[in-house]
Amino acid sequence: MSDLRDVPERDGVPAATAPSPSRRGLLRLGGGLVAASAFGLSFGAGGAAAAVPAGKRFSLTEPSHDLFRHAKLHDARVQQSFTFDIVNRRLFVAQLKSGSPDDSGDLCITQLDFSGNKLGHMYLLGFGHGVSIGAQPVGADTYLWTEVDVNSNARGTRLARFKWNNGATLSRTSSALAKHQPIPGATEMTCAIDPVNNRMAIRYLTASGRRYGVYNVADIAAGVYDKPLSDVPHPTGLGTFQGYALYGSYVYQLTGNPYGPDNPNPGNSYVSSVDVNTGALVQRAFTRAGSTLTFREPEGMGIYRTAAGEVRLFLGFASGVAGDRRSNLFYKNVLI
């Protein structure tokens, strides 16, 4: 497979020109509606001691670039998340399974090439909403990480690791799954993998609130859960949560809603960066990536490193009409 191509996205604008987030775009976390402002945000109790080496972060006000637009997934519903295997140069996109109830936890994973052409698919039954997935290369194989064991809120309660197997259908009780419960008492959890540094961010919910924990991927895969590198509160008041990614010492979040009468173009999509050692919101910027798309719902984030060594922060957007939703990926590549 060829490497990711570089096609400029022309409609990115700095945050200074962006509209303020709408009241409709506020985020419900912990049962409370929190008023949003760009930096007047609330956090829970203090996080773990800093253990993730500090490094560069992506500039979120730089314009975005296209990878592809209007890619057709195996099923017809909106994408929820995506992930890259940067060793074997593979891309996987998650969506809810067509024909299944929204609360079933049934997912479809589509493998695409970097031009958006379909290469394969898997079905996962009883897993979750597909909020975030991760890919772990093992030689020439790819192992996927997803949420599993769907709850009454249509979210997974544990993590599952399994080998990508084109055309297969796995139930939540399949022997092909290795299940993990790294956070005791968590009622929801998903993960995102930093493929450059081989670390994993786990976004989880307990009775005390929602948080991010950062671990080494190898530790979680081995069932070693008592070595978190950091653990910080999840920021509130940023808008409707739509995905996250981990790179270095920062978690990146995507928020916003699809276009509609209450959210016309240019929409209310924002990208933010959070220091995983302190929980501090470092930057928040409005994004117009893919602003000309129809529907344009922000859906998913990911990290990729090209063969030449350039690291990219990807943003996903769903487009199209009901019954024919499409996948669209854009990226930022300026580190500061």
Language-model-detected regions and their locations in the chain:
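N-terminal secretory signal peptides
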Residues: 1-21, 33-41
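N-terminal export leaders
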Residues: 23-31
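Beta-strand-rich domains and repeat architectures in extracellular enzymes and scaffolds
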Residues: 71-100
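Structural signature of eukaryotic scaffold interfaces centered on beta-propeller domains
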Residues: 76-87, 132-140, 185-197, 243-247, ...
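Beta-propeller domains
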Residues: 92-123
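Beta-propeller blade signature
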Residues: 106-114, 157-166, 214-217, 266-277, ...
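Blade-loop segments of beta-propeller domains
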Residues: 116-141
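Loop/turn-rich, solvent-exposed surfaces of beta-rich toroidal or solenoidal domains
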Residues: 236-273
